[in-house]
Amino acid sequence: MIKILLLIDYSSEFDRKLLRGLVQYSKENGPWLFYRLPSYYSAMYGEQGILKWAKEWKADAIIGQWHNDTIDLQKELNIPVVLQNYHHRSVTYSNLTGDYKGTGRMAAQFFAKRMFRNFAYFGIKGVVWSDERRQGYHQEVKRIGGDFFSFESDKQEDEIRMEVSQWLQELPKPVALFCCDD
């Protein structure tokens, strides 16, 4: 039986769907044995604790979030590692990712079909899926000759509420607004 160590939170819909998909794949192609470390485990024991746990359990693969590349998991464990990182794509490991630029282009096309000429984007700075959605959206808006407006921040919602409110009021109307997150 293949042992898969999961470093996945289950608080978001994406994560829950990912977990369901892994279980379904295991049923069709397994059997796989999953073990999900609680999200607090990394905070309590750090990367070395996760590495130690994976070695002791004799994991055959790791799937999940790994926020920094200070430990080379493949070198230390000699097993496949697939990551779903929030801020950036890993250059060391395989990545679970989406066609974020394509999502941005599709959003712009959706609004263009509804005859919008002003296109606004609200995003989070420094997060791969937000950055790439903006890029795709902006590229498509530029291609179709629309006007593009963007607001991006890495601050918490309560810190930027007034800035966002002012930005929204100043946008030319009518405007198509694409937000980075569902």
What do the PLM-derived regions correspond to, one by one?
Residues 1-61, 71-182:
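Bacterial carbohydrate/catabolite-sensing allosteric modules
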